[in-house]
Amino acid sequence: MINAVLKTPALSSWTEKANFFGARKLPFVFLIDFEAGNAEIFTFHEALEKGIRWSFPDGHRSVPVPQHPPAIQLEKYPISLEEYDQKFQQVMSALQYGDSFLTNLTVSTPIKTNLGLLDIYRFANAPFKVYWPDKFVVFSPERFVKIQSGKIYTYPMKGTIKDEKGAEQLLSNIKEQEEKATVVDLMRNDLAMNSRDVQVERFRYAEAIQTDRGKIWQTSSKISGRLPSFFHEKIGSIIASMLPAGSISGAPKKRTVEIIQESEGEPRGWYTGVCGYYDGADLDSAVMIRFIEKTDKGLVFRSGGGITAKSTADQEYQEMIDKIYVPVY
């Protein structure tokens, strides 16, 4: 494995299997959790037998997407600002000591909705969707890595603002600019481990995301590199070396992951892991954000954002709440 931050038996086994499939150009579906304690690889048939469903923006989906969604009802019960601030201050302490330049802090929020996980999967408007029965549903706006025609691309997403404030304010925000620069540099280095001619094709651009309560804006970047001709036989190693995704961890990655585990106080599990498919030629994948998990106590929505030395607890708390939405409209 190439310079991997995460080194677990599950990820090592997954990497070997993915390289085996890639060398033979055999299609597969994959899911890897944030801590890499669980790493699954299935043939398309095996995934469907388990009830796993997926939909990606190039039209690759397991089942047709229905029209005419029902009206959604969504209630959320976030932790208090005081509780959030305790976690926030742990992160800020690490930032002030110089242990991290950027740390992604997330929390769990109990929710109630009139729709089940499969309904949300079927009707959510999102480029990347995955449903795993009795586990979770993902409706992610963020691509992780795309491999196409011998090139590798990544599109880190950072920065969120409500529509009424507009994309211009998001793009001009100094804190958001610095956060984006840190993530872009991190992901550029990740690509450079496996490819050459790495370049930032688009540094920062705003995209609107429609929710059940109006629009929010987020900024993304586009970074690319050229893979060696034998990349298929190393496709598992390439993905594993870039985990966890930089946009949902931080920099420097190894120490920041430790800070995340200390401050959040619970494993993320599948949330902020990665999922994707390989069709024998190309690969596409997503970061598993916008995530609803089924637990013994009901449904839980996981959300958060990037913390820098210029962050404030009240703004980050509000961003965490703003990201609790279901794009059914």
Question: Which residues fall in each region the model found?
Answer:
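Extended alpha-helical targeting/anchoring segments
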Residues: M1-Y329
